[in-house]
Amino acid sequence: MPRPQHHALLRAMLKLLLFASIAEHCATALPTNSSNSPSSPSPFTVASLPPTTASSSSSPAVISTSSFDRNLADLVNPEAETSGSGWESLETEFNLATTVDSSTQKTAKEPVLGTAATSIEQQDQPPDVPATTLAFANAFPVPVAGEMGNGNGNYNDATPPYAAVDDNYVPSKPQNLTILDVSANSITMSWHPPKNQNGAIAGYHVFHIHDNQTGVEIVKNSRNSVETLIHFELQNLRPYTDYRVIVKAFTTKNEGEPSDQIAQRTDVGGPSAPAIVNLTCHSQESITIRWRRPYEFYNTIDFYIIKTRLAGQDTHRDIRINASAKELETAMILQNLTTNSYYEVKVAAATFSVINPKKIVLGKFSESRIIQLQPNCEKLQPLLRQSHNDYNLAVLVGIIFSCFGIILIIMAFFLWSRKCFHAAYYYLDDPPHHPNAPQVDWEVPVKIGDEIRAAVPVNEFAKHVASLHADGDIGFSREYEAIQNECISDDLPCEHSQHPENKRKNRYLNITAYDHSRVHLHPTPGQKKNLDYINANFIDGYQKGHAFIGTQGPLPDTFDCFWRMIWEQRVAIIVMITNLVERGRRKCDMYWPKDGVETYGVIQVKLIEEEVMSTYTVRTLQIKHLKLKKKKQCNTEKLVYQYHYTNWPDHGTPDHPLPVLNFVKKSSAANPAEAGPIVVHCSAGVGRTGTYIVLDAMLKQIQQKNIVNVFGFLRHIRAQRNFLVQTEEQYIFLHDALVEAIASGETNLMAEQVEELKNCTPYLEQQYKNIIQFQPKDIHIASAMKQVNSIKNRGAIFPIEGSRVHLTPKPGEDGSDYINASWLHGFRRLRDFIVTQHPMAHTIKDFWQMVWDHNAQTVVLLSSLDDINFAQFWPDEATPIESDHYRVKFLNKTNKSDYVSRDFVIQSIQDDYELTVKMLHCPSWPEMSNPNSIYDFIVDVHERCNDYRNGPIVIVDRYGGAQACTFCAISSLAIEMEYCSTANVYQYAKLYHNKRPGVWTSSEDIRVIYNILSFLPGNLNLLKRTALRTEFEDVTTATPDLYSKICSNGNVPQHVILQQQQLHMLQLQQQHLETQQQQQQQQQQQQQQQQTALNETVSTPSTDTNPSLLPILSLLPPTVAPLSSSSSTTPPTPSTPTPQPPQTIQLSSHSPSDLSHQISSTVANAASPVTPATASASAGATPTTPMTPTVPPTIPTIPSLASQNSLTLTNANFHTVTNNAADLMEHQQQQMLALMQQQTQLQQQYNTHPQQHHNNVGDLLMNNADNSPTASPTITNNNHITNNNVTSAAATDAQNLDIVG
């Protein structure tokens, strides 16, 4: 036997002897099973020690032999010796005991791993502890391998109890961490397991760090894995980025020591697509092409590849030219082409790999451009250039003379007006003063330092923003610093702001108005010229000069100047983005009347109406000039609307951009096209003001050009007012808001859009993905995850810290302020609702404490009490609920059709204060008997709240989830549709998820909201308006139709009003034609149905037409009317079979669409004979289970008939009804086509002779007023019917209905 094998056998024998001595010292021996391998010389019997507790009086044995330390380490680490041959494995457990120095016992701290913006903190690691330093009461598995002959020993598959390893010791560091392969987005590496594992290695943590950003990947280890080399590929990395990689092993208890750090840079990625800016004919055989450098590339651009081919052919020619990343544009001439041919050209950039210099990384190709080569094109281009120059010269001369003429006209008008009007009066409708400002083409790419700033395509903007966020937002810092440095210039003076008499008009000393763009006030009689000052500047919008006026929050001394500016500049919209007081400091003074009328200088301001919403308030103000001579066809009174955003936090930026985007869109759209600029102000008129203006401009740029250029536009408008977008945080918020706007699209939907989108599954799926994009981290739900609070949570829905409801804390009791409840906003208030779970037995008092603390007088309970886990949590008549501070008593109970109302009173124990509470219990929400019941329930809740509106509405369902949030959303959207005529389902759903993640489980939850909204009646009257009376009739009550109100008060010319009136008359004519067509259809339908019924009666040996068929027929399309029972007159014959028992069809009442599906399914199955067996089977099929509609959206749904739960229908005449329905539906389509043609002819006639139609429409309506029916069906775009007659027909045959539900 070779010498090394002798040594290995001796070492194994020595190990067994040492363990036997330990067993003798402790006077206890526990034999273990030995290997039954036939190749083993003899089975081993190894002793182990029993557990020793801390209370044991005997001292543990001390082993200090250095040789034992080394040999035991070899045993614990089975990979210490793997060479050998011929041995089969033995694996045995050893219970070892030694004394451990308490000074060396340190708990291994877990590394603090943050998100993409946090760094890994260096933690103290325990020192290397020899493997012999093991404690009692811990089982250490020791795999043993023997050697004999020339065979290789293997370890057995036994699974030792690794969980018993001492928690104080961790695995050593992984060894030989090596990089194997690198690409642009991945790094492949390998490493060996730790030498000292100290337990079963459950896996590895792979940390990848670049700058301040740390990511971690988990590599799980298989249960019985004995791999000596681990491979892993890091993916989704950034191209051309330096990464540092560290690997740590971990067991089920602890994380091990870090490996040696290794640094690696990823490879470059492909550049983005260049943009071809010029493609022209150079000669009849050559083309000139010019392109712009890609806006995104890594390291450098080494060359370009130009692909050319004849249009329509597959073969192409590649041309490669060297390039430099410093060149913004590149041009070349493509020669040797064919005359009179079309060529397709595209360009791509490429760079060499930094990992493998021989490898080429090709970027994206530009969009293909097509050009035609023509003879003599080289002669045409100089002629075009010369003509262009001559044209420019002519235009320049024309502009100069035109300007000179305009100046003369203005001077003559000025002298004439001074002569005609007294000097003590102002002058009406003077043109606003728009001074000349430096013009900058901000859409052209610019070079700042070594970087190019250009517009970004919409489809790549999210990626662009993500790159700016990388490395701790370093990209934003560089861009904002470039803007700050460039906009500091002495070339833009502010001399008027520094005038001694004007300094007091500045709220802040450093916020002044540039002279070249400031707003000039018209001088008053006897006023000095330098007193035309106000701290305000004209600011450009997107493709519109002087679209905005940016100004500071008015001071009391400047109220008169502010309102003079509003009047003189024809301002219709004021945007205010600040509160009067923030953080205890005065930010703006109240420059409008609190109620009634206030006079500021020569302008009188009257508050007409104030509409308060959750995030902003709209005020309607009437302004009147007191020193203006009223001229013919001119008003001295105008309406101005103030949009006041009230939810901008005192410090920083809003939590989410959706409310801000909605505010920007609505306030900007309210400004009439022919009105003056929008006045925007915050406190200083620079930070939030600039954010608003940039958002509005970029939203319009996205809509018109599908590109975004925040950098260029902000750089442009900063030359018009200083410090716009005042902080880097606001600059970042701008980009994040635009990313959200691009992802969500237009979310304010009209009623007809809600109807269309409720059946658009791809749209709902995409919305759902965007809604649940936010995933909370531990810091967001820290209170909910505390151990003391975990028993207060029913499920996995937790409140976010910033929106959770707080209880009055109890001194010295941790977690006493926690309840699983969240604040949700409604249409009116930010804290309109409290959504919470069904109280558990140990949280009932917490629930009533919450009601008491927050003065909630309305509780809506949506969970049922069927389950024992969801028991009653309110007091009954005999047993009140008492706490240290209050007592809850039951008052009375009222049963309604779909819900139960209970009244309670909460009395204070310390004083006489008491709080009345009404609980509305509706366990069937939202699957009530019919849609009208849904809205009746909502109206009842809001009527209660209008009477007692001191606190929020508490909404309770089982887990505080989808049911409760659906109620909040529907309640808010119903008011929004009444006020704004739009519904923003996406905004409510996403903000609810952000405040209470997990409430939406699928896109079907979002579909439920759309389904309910689609049946929203128009007379909910949920708004409780606070309109103030006025002295003129046209604005007695303000309405959301801001444009029409502005038009009626002199801010828009009369021809616009006339156009609106003409359009209204046209709509009346169309409605009249629709009514006539519907009457004709009804008459034809009745005649056809009578004829069909008569034919059926003659051919079918039936005693009578079953009257129970009438309700079913009323659910068919509008052309199918109920059959008249009087039409069946044929007497029965002797051979008439016995009538079949009536077939009961169960109609679930979950939604009208489900009802339509069941009716249509019944009609579809009518072709097959129905037997009593099948009828009974159909009758008993799960009457309470909702059915998912599978029919196309064209199937008509009848809200008025959805309340019928069950119908009894016989089989007689069923085939005839089905055939007639198909024929009549085809006839209806023909009638609708004829109606559309008549409407088109009417439109053409109106466009030709609008005045004639205007005069005749009144007579036309009067002549037909007496002939119109009292209730005629209205056919909508989706073939829905709303007809009281149909409902009455169904009610007439109520005796034929078999109500089952």
UniProtKB/Swiss-Prot annotation:
CDD domains: FN3, R5-PTP-2, R5-PTPc-1. Selectively expressed in a subset of axons and pioneer neurons (including aCC and RP2) in the embryo. Glycans are attached at N33, N176, N212, N278, N322, N336. GO terms for molecular function: protein tyrosine phosphatase activity; transmembrane receptor protein tyrosine phosphatase activity. One of its GO terms (biological process) is signal transduction. Residues 1-28 form the signal peptide. It is a single-pass type I membrane protein. Its main location: membrane. Residues 33-63, 1107-1130, 1162-1188 have a biased composition (Low complexity). It is found in: Membrane. This is Tyrosine-protein phosphatase 99A. It comes from Drosophila melanogaster (Fruit fly). The gene is Ptp99A.
